[in-house]
């Protein structure tokens, strides 16, 4: 890396690294450093009456206060933080005090990883600390961390810009309290979910991520090219059709927790790459699945929060069963006053116009109903609510309702104004399923790029016979948002999708060289703010030379600066 691309702190840290090497101290040792304690456990278990305890801990140095022969530092490990007392004569019992005077005081930097062996004690101010007897450098940090300070409950200099936090999640995790807890809770959600599903006898499986047909949902897929077979492939938008094949094959119940990909928009509740759990169980229907889902979410909430309640944006949401069950057409009637039962596509279009919804000719009956529900109903369901009995046009993979013509046995679980889960009594009639696929293809012909493609192999599987089955898909990211009280999906994803970083426009070195400048002087010009050849025209030769000289002096560069006359000649070329 060019030294001119580094900050003064980064340059100093690299100088410290070289000094450590000269002292024979490995900045990145290869050997294991066995620890036997964590910060939180030490703080929780300490007793003034107990025998003195020696511990070995390791972590990142987050602060340091040097007071002559004695110092304090704050060590952050994977569990929390603890104060370490560092006394010169304790870590340097002999004549050589280099480890304290040079290494600890001058060559270590905030962010460095160190190992400490010492005994636990309570300071005169009452703080439980570790009295260091041995100090070992474990890893040198070359970039300074943002220094987040806290006083009287107020946070200063916080690392809070959302874009920076999401791009540099590693820094976010280090310096911002509570961020790591989000992802520990996410792990609890997944662990609890797996435990419950496994205890019920269901088998976790893995199905293809690369698929020849993007089936199982209505969404726009990501495409890629499979070179070995010379065919177009799709990143899966759902796991549904492969999991149903396994039910055909004889599994009692199967589930998969994995990534799905939908080539659609990004916002506070959508990420194109998202985690979903899909479950399929034979001999069950959507009524059974509603009851099972209530029990599942109630247990997950207790595991994460210690109760059946979670607070999101000031709203207390109760996951205690049972949840309200409301047919979708009744929900629309309740929220808009329009009764859509028995209405055809043309009549529903008229309702959309009266509601001043933006619609187009590609939208079929199902899409129109979906638009009405999404605009006027969805956001109003804060407490968990099962929206049931969707029209067949909205549900191409769902069994027809046993007693309501034109409707299907499907539910979506709404929580905090968003869909959390989608479930069916699964369609297992292969003839009916083929007819539904054909209807979807008609929508595709009209321009609906989210319509389903016919999956002939799935139809073949159904022809061998699939038992009555219920299935559900639960969005894990949204579930974690609800369990942790966050309003944006990016907060619960370790590395959310982001737009490319903005980069300062910069001309190539060759463009500057063509003017007669040396290649080695170009980074100096960039440091002075001349990133484009055209930038030179905004200044005078004498000023440019002065700026170059200042950079060369500051960074002790052994390069020759161009003369004023040479720069004037170059400026003439730029202006011409």
Regions found by a protein language model. Name each.
Residues 500-576:
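Compact, charge-rich alpha-helical regulatory domains located at protein termini
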Residues 1-504:
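Class II aminoacyl-tRNA synthetase catalytic cores and aaRS-like
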